[in-house]
Curated annotation (Swiss-Prot):
This is Probable phosphatase Athe_0620. InterPro entries: Phosphatase_YcdX_put, PHP_dom, PHP_phosphatase, Pol/His_phosphatase_N, Pol/histidinol_Pase-like. GO terms for molecular function: phosphoric ester hydrolase activity; zinc ion binding. Belongs to the PHP family. Zn(2+) 1 binds at H8, H10, E74, D192. It comes from Caldicellulosiruptor bescii (strain ATCC BAA-1888 / DSM 6725 / KCTC 15123 / Z-1320). Its EC number is 3.1.3.-. Its cofactor is Zn(2+). Zn(2+) 3 binds at E74, H102, H132. Zn(2+) 2 binds at H16, H41, H194. Binds 3 Zn(2+) ions per subunit. Pfam families: PHP.
Length: 240
């Protein structure tokens, strides 16, 4: 299965990634993608950019070298109520917002704490996707989170990078994938690229999706059209 839209990648603005925005877009073009979401880390991530960066992303052209560019963010969840580190005035100007738990932004708590945090983020109308929920550092009630995503029509990310950098993520991701299939919940397949060579790299995620016969119509970034249709569910009217 080939993905047409990269939904999760970082530029040098995140502070610990290694290419600029244009380099990431050009790499997406080389790999035959049709769209890319630039999702730099929110300001609570040490070394990342300020909220002004996200507010001003609107100056980035919608297309660069024929590739659709979606203005996004990987917001940090900063408390167990699911609050994030991006102000509303910036969120309103973004196309696609991922919310994630990161250990440098919020300590690990209980399963109940983590579950409440993710569900709180899911309820935020400006958030479209939950990032790497398979992280074993933040164990969750997976069924509760998946059911909340279904209720609010949000996507759950199956993060390919997790299989390399977050030990024991695979078992959690498989369980989440099965639950999303069971309940008809959207997923996004993201590389979480911090270097241009990893753009569109979702080989393990794609293998699991095929192995567990996940419905293609629930993969939001399977095609450019499916991604834009998903965004329209959340009030984003973007023309191809």
């Amino acid at each position: 299965m080939f993905l047409e839209v990269e939904t999760h990648c970082h530029t040098i603005a995140s502070g610990h990634a290694y290419n600029n925005l244009e380099e990431m877009v050009l790499e997406a073009q080389k790999k035959g993608l049709k769209g890319i979401c630039i999702t730099d880390h929110g300001p609570e991530m040490p070394g990342s950019c300020s909220s002004l960066y996200f507010y001003n992303l609107i100056v980035v052209p919608r297309k660069i070298n024929g590739i659709m560019v979606f203005r996004g963010c990987e917001a940090n969840i900063v408390d167990y109520e699911g609050r994030i580190d991006i102000p509303e005035d910036a969120l309103k100007r973004l196309d696609f917002v991922i919310a994630s738990l990161h250990d440098v932004c919020i300590p690990s708590g209980t399963v109940s704490d983590h579950t409440r945090a993710l569900i709180g983020a899911i309820k935020n109308p400006y958030i479209h996707c939950i990032g790497h929920p398979g992280n074993p550092l933040y164990e969750i009630d997976k069924e509760e989170v998946v059911l909340a995503a279904k209720e609010y029509k949000k996507a759950i990310e199956i993060n390919n990078s997790s299989f390399y950098v977050r030990e024991k993520s695979k078992e959690n991701c498989i369980e989440i994938l099965k639950l999303c299939k069971k309940y008809g919940v959207y997923i996004a397949m993201g590389s979480d690229a911090h270097y241009k060579a990893d753009i569109g790299r979702c080989e393990i995620t794609q293998k699991l999706v095929c192995e567990y016969e996940f419905p293609p119509e629930l993969i939001v970034n399977k095609s450019l059209e499916s991604f834009i249709s998903f965004l329209k569910l959340h009030g984003k009217d973007i023309d191809i």
